[in-house]
Amino acid sequence: MSQPRPLLSPPETEEQLLAQAQQLSGYTLGELAALAGLVTPENLKRDKGWIGVLLEIWLGASAGSKPEQDFAALGVELKTIPVDSLGRPLETTFVCVAPLTGNSGVTWETSHVRHKLKRVLWIPVEGERSIPLAQRRVGSPLLWTPNEEEDRQLREDWEELMDMIVLGQVERITARHGEYLQIRPKAANAKALTEAIGARGERILTLPRGFYLKKNFTSALLARHFLIQ
């Protein structure tokens, strides 16, 4: 069997994207890095986004850190998800930065969260720390669109969390708010502050926040599609 090659330009169809992702299934991260001419870091402590970058190179992703989807022409977002030996997610999944100001008139339908999650290519990757990074294998891809129930679950959490932001309660939001979607600080250091609305409607400075999918949401999603027991 011939070795796969990274896509040199963005895929033109979902079928091409999925076919390329399926070719990567079963390869280790070290093998894919070597085939792409990259060096595999010893661990992810200083290279937290390395796996995502590696797979973006292989799949011809275009967006980088821009607000549009990774495959903007297809409207598809790429999400790598570290899983244990039973295929269960090991951590929450970052969706996008949470807007803390300028939220008047924003609805779920027009929200950045929904835009990012309306079509997702999930790629599970072995994530147990006992497995050296280079030896972790890539799993089978899943091209997913939220069904009605999933959309409702996410919408209810998003509305609850956005209400708290708009009402000046951002500092009261904890990771326990939201059943499937949570907001928590997203900053490499505590000095990176951003503007938000305070309890009396005044401008305050606070840590940037991000939206994350909780493990119970992604676990059910993967289990349903891969029939994990």
UniProtKB/Swiss-Prot annotation:
Output a single Gene Ontology CC term carried by this record: cytoplasm
Which CDD domains does the UniProt record give? MutH-like (cd00583)
Please classify the protein's predominant subcellular localization into one broad category.
Answer: cytoplasm
Function, in words: Sequence-specific endonuclease that cleaves unmethylated GATC sequences. It is involved in DNA mismatch repair.
Compartments it resides in: Cytoplasm
State the Gene Ontology terms under molecular function.
DNA binding; endonuclease activity
Q: Which family does it belong to?
A: Belongs to the MutH family.
Q: Name one GO biological process term.
A: mismatch repair
- Can you name this protein? DNA mismatch repair protein MutH
Classification via SUPFAM superfamilies? Restriction endonuclease-like
Which Pfam family, giving just one, matches this sequence? MutH
The protein's UniProt keywords, in alphabetical order, are: Cytoplasm, DNA damage, DNA repair, Endonuclease, Hydrolase, Nuclease
From which organism does this entry originate?
Answer: Shigella boydii serotype 18 (strain CDC 3083-94 / BS512)
User: What gene name is listed for this protein?
Assistant: mutH
- Alphabetical list of InterPro entries matching this protein: DNA_mismatch_repair_MutH, DNA_rep_MutH/RE_typeII_Sau3AI, DNA_rep_MutH/T2_RE_sf, Restrct_endonuc-II-like
